[in-house]
């Protein structure tokens, strides 16, 4: 009887772990049926993606809200939170970082690097 309870408990823990991993995963993009809206044809629109986004959007402009699930800020801007901390990228696992797109107050110039999901599009 003890073996059965231990086995059942182990199965429940494994199932819970798998469900948590799937909840943090992005669904694959189906480009055969996907219909993306065209982006504006101007220099102000820098194509970027949300963490699980399949279609490009214009990157965040100055004073736009930014966090781990929004499209990244324009390459000339950084995401600044209420304490003044700057991030060029807010990664999907940084759940507590929320801010607005602003010009950097630091003297260091950021060099833009494509996110992993941006190079695959």
Swiss-Prot record:
GO cellular component, one term: extracellular region
Keywords attached to this entry: Disulfide bond, Glycoprotein, Secreted, Signal
PROSITE patterns tied to this protein: IGFBP_N_1 (PS00222), IGFBP_N_2 (PS51323)
Disulfide bonds, paired cysteine numbers: 26-52, 29-54, 36-55, 45-58, 66-79, 73-101
Keyword Transmembrane helix carried by entry: no
Tissue-by-tissue expression: Component of the acid-insoluble organic matrix of calcified layers of the shell (at protein level).
Positions annotated as glycosylated: 68, 81, 117
Location of the IGFBP N-terminal domain: 24-104
Signal peptide limits: 1-23
Protein's name according to its UniProt entry: Perlustrin-like protein
Organism the protein comes from: Lottia gigantea
Species lineage: Eukaryota, Metazoa, Spiralia, Lophotrochozoa, Mollusca
């Amino acid at each position: 009887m003890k073996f059965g309870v231990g086995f059942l408990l182990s199965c429940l823990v494994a199932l819970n772990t798998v469900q948590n991993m799937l909840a943090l995963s992005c669904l694959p993009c189906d480009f055969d049926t996907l219909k993306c809206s065209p982006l504006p044809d101007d220099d102000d629109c820098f194509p970027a993606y949300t963490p699980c986004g399949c279609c490009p959007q214009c990157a965040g402009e100055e004073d736009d809200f930014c966090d781990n699930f929004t499209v990244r800020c324009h390459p000339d801007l950084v995401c600044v939170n209420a304490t003044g901390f700057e991030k060029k990228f807010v990664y999907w696992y940084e759940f507590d970082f929320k801010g607005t797109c602003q010009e950097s107050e630091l003297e260091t110039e950021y060099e833009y690097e494509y996110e992993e999901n941006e190079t695959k599009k």
